[in-house]
Design a protein with these regions (language model features):
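Active-site acidic-Proline motif in GNAT/NAT acetyltransferases
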Residues: 110-116, 144-145
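Short coil/turn segments at alpha/beta junctions that flank glycine-rich nucleotide-binding fingerprints
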Residues: 100, 116, 132-136
Length: 199
């Protein structure tokens, strides 16, 4: 897989996937993460089946938002933004999980741009960024109701694995992507802090 540019990569239809500029875009990332939180809160109600189990995750996410960039900043993390014209329409985040293992989090697309486009684009870019940071493997979890996301994770080479953290939602799915199963690519000087809690 060809690594993403350190600045940005241009996707079809005028969309640019680029790294966040923390010094000037912290509030923008907070707004996007709050949008993700609101979306996740919708899974606390029927018919998703997640129920109140989502509520602890919402409380943890509130703390994550307050502490940004936190684990999503250097040296082991990053946030990518999808930009179409003047608008930032989606985001995705990467953080360290274990040494040489990263984790994708916070894939969020604004409601007015949802469809089969931005999620896969962001995941591809995050995998390339993970390799730049030196990660050999990348993990991700998904709620059981996230059928489209689960499908494109598997299409991109993620394989199902046992739970790697105590997810509060029954039936949550866990996946891992391995760079060893792809053609060799340029790797950065990555490293990772000790293992973290899942949320």
């Amino acid at each position: 897989m060809k690594p993403a540019s350190h600045a940005h990569r241009t996707e079809p239809a005028g969309t640019v996937i680029r790294r966040v500029e923390w010094a000037s875009e912290l509030d923008r990332v907070r707004r996007l993460f709050r949008g993700y939180r609101d979306w996740l809160a919708g899974h606390a109600s029927p018919p998703t089946g997640s129920g109140p189990a989502v509520l602890p995750a919402l409380a943890r996410l509130d703390r994550v938002i307050a502490d940004l960039p936190g684990v999503y900043g250097p040296p082991g993390g990053d946030v990518l933004l999808a930009v179409r014209g003047p608008d930032v329409v989606a985001c995705g985040a990467l953080r360290a999980w274990e040494p040489r293992v990263g984790e994708i989090k916070r894939i969020y697309v604004r409601a007015d741009h949802r469809g089969p486009v931005f999620g896969p684009k962001l995941v591809r870019a995050l995998l390339a960024r993970a390799e730049e940071l030196g990660y050999d493997r990348v993990r991700v979890d998904a709620l059981p109701s996230m059928e489209a996301a689960i499908q494109y994770y598997q299409e991109m080479g993620f394989r199902p694995i046992p739970a790697y953290w105590a997810h509060p939602v029954p039936g949550a799915r866990f996946f891992e992507w391995s760079a060893a199963e792809r053609a060799p690519v340029r790797r950065g000087r990555g490293g990772a802090p000790p293992r973290r809690s899942g949320a």
